[in-house]
Amino acid sequence: MTEIERIDQLREELHRHNYNYYVLNAPEITDQEFDKLMRELQDLEEKHPEHRDENSPSMRVGSDINKNFTQVVHKYPMLSLANTYSETEVTEFYDRVKKSLNEDFEICCEMKYDGTSISLTYENGKLVRAVTRGDGVQGDDVTGNVKTIRSIPLVLHGKGYPETFEIRGEILMPWVVFEELNKEREAREEPLFANPRNAASGTLKLQNSAIVASRKLDAYLYYLLGDNLPCDGHYENLKEAEKWGFKISDLTRKCKTLQEVFDFIKYWDVERKNLPVATDGIVLKVNSLRQQRNLGFTAKSPRWAIAYKFQAEQALTRLNKVTYQVGRTGAVTPVANLDPIQLSGTVVKRASLHNADIIEGLDLHIGDMVYVEKGGEIIPKIVGVDKDARIMIGDKVKFITHCPECGSKLVRYEGEAAYYCTNDAACPPQIKGKIEHFISRRAMNIDGLGPETVDQFYQEGLIRDVADLYTLKTSDIINLERMGEKSAENIIKGIEQSKEVPFERVLFALGIRFVGETVAKKVAKSFKSMDALADASLDNLIHVDEIGEKIAQSILLYFANPKNRDIIERLRVAGVRLEADEEDTSEHTDKLAGKSIVISGVFAHHSRDEYKELIEKHGGKNVGSISSKTSFILAGDNMGPSKLEKAQKLGVTIVSEEEFLQMIE
């Protein structure tokens, strides 16, 4: 046997052993024997670099190469599921499906694992891409990190799998691994992860795949997409995928009646506490893919599936004290410090009290025995007090009057529950929070910078506002702790590249209260430059589509602050884009002038957002709901039956994708 043949043999053997150990939980060899085979493979691969294979089992150990993730557009959007919380809502879902299909159907019941969603693409039996959910339209390419997860096959075995397909699932951190990781972080005085989902998500986004490999992530796969799938049944496809090497939950059940669905839910509402990974509900899916296609989608979720969320678990523990946190907007949030208590698989020591009204309503006293609940199984909150357990009444909890970080007097705006620190220019958490928002992906998208780096730069006195970022030089940061030459250069490069971010995102990045992405786009489209916006009157602002007086007043207040104007001036000097691009109107027409158009369904040639732009480009107006004033509906595949019914009732014209494209030619 040649060394090349031995490499191929070892790869095949190690793939099989990985599957037996991590998926079947039935190892055939000891860990020592596995490691010996792996070392032999690594030695041979080092001798024969020309025989490198990205899907070799040796690639699972990870690499310490630091690279930025690229964004990948999903071939099929990763939509979220509609949530339900009661048997009544489950019954309503079941009845809707029954009415729409008017034929027999089965419901596939699956555990709703609480991790981070992933989409895996396989071509010719090999893993070629792993992408996070992201915003549902596009996500991060984390293929290198996913290859370190032993329960995900790099190369499929068996036969019958399509030439190309996607399989989706959940990346998880088992409870035992989560507890071990937090113990290690506590020993190193590092911040603890709040729950396994955050730990799994954070791990998957690490730039160092060697660390990812050490975190022992797991994965369950739950949905196949693509052409030429083996079966019409979703459940049956999962069974086939299991034969190809995927880890499929053996808890999934196919139900023929609503009562069977409820029996499944009730059983796992109790037994889920004994599972090795976090779950927060049950997913119900119509089993037939043909029936799924017939039912279609809403704008946000499929009509053929829902998520039933378990009721939050409660525990009783003692309130020791109340501390306060300040967010980037200056909102002050009270936090209850508790005796440690086990709740939904994690140790809870702190819980949110939300605002002063909640504290007053609970009539809280230090030393009270309080009921703690995890909303959605994740965020702990106090929901009640056991007043019968009061033997000695401690001090009544009263909301603070001054900022715990900078000492400024707190204010409460009319109609709001929260108290605010208005010292936004000198309050450390607000400063750091604003900078973190500024550098985020949807804003300036500055690679290499994150909350830890922002905190480090702030502590070193290098930055005090967002404009300070543009004065940084490589020499300023290269000698900082955990900062090398390459990292420093990447950060400066990322800051420089952010100068090309369009005006609408710069406006969003400033963090003006109530000015989110959508508002920023509308404002930028109306005012074209930061100067024009700064000079706008209240009347000018409220005439912008969807901008009410509250948002307008917030914008005026922002520009009335000399410190904010100074920051904008320094951003201008740095070269940040404070004007909108000259809009190319050469292709604008009035072919759709005066027409109100509703978009519905899934399209082949353009995305929904692209069609919205085309409608506006040709003089039309996008509207969200059908009425007698609707000119026509641009309908793609899987148009919702309720919209179709309403359109027919009102006599609204249905226009296909091809017909629409001909209209604007």
Swiss-Prot record:
InterPro entries: BRCT_dom, BRCT_dom_sf, DisA/LigA_HHH, DNA_ligase, DNA_ligase_CS, DNAligase_adenylation, DNAligase_N, Hlx-hairpin-Hlx_DNA-bd_motif. Its EC number is 6.5.1.2. One of its GO terms (cellular component) is cytosol. It is an enzyme of class 6 (ligase). Its cofactor is Mg(2+); Mn(2+). One of its GO terms (molecular function) is metal ion binding. It comes from the Bacteria. GO terms for biological process: DNA repair; DNA replication. Keywords: DNA damage, DNA repair, DNA replication, Ligase, Magnesium, Manganese, Metal-binding, NAD, Zinc. It holds the Pfam family DNA_ligase_aden. Zn(2+) binds at C403, C406, C421, C427. NAD(+) binds at D31, Q32, E33, F34, D35, S80, L81, E110, R133, E170, K285, K309. It catalyses: NAD(+) + (deoxyribonucleotide)n-3'-hydroxyl + 5'-phospho-(deoxyribonucleotide)m = (deoxyribonucleotide)n+m + AMP + beta-nicotinamide D-nucleotide. Residues 587-665 form the BRCT domain. The active site is at K112. DNA ligase that catalyzes the formation of phosphodiester linkages between 5'-phosphoryl and 3'-hydroxyl groups in double-stranded DNA using NAD as a coenzyme and as the energy source for the reaction. It is essential for DNA replication and repair of damaged DNA. Belongs to the NAD-dependent DNA ligase family. LigA subfamily. PANTHER family: CHROMOSOME TRANSMISSION FIDELITY FACTOR 18, DNA LIGASE. HAMAP family: DNA_ligase_A (MF_01588). This is DNA ligase. It comes from Phocaeicola vulgatus (strain ATCC 8482 / DSM 1447 / JCM 5826 / CCUG 4940 / NBRC 14291 / NCTC 11154) (Bacteroides vulgatus). The gene is ligA.
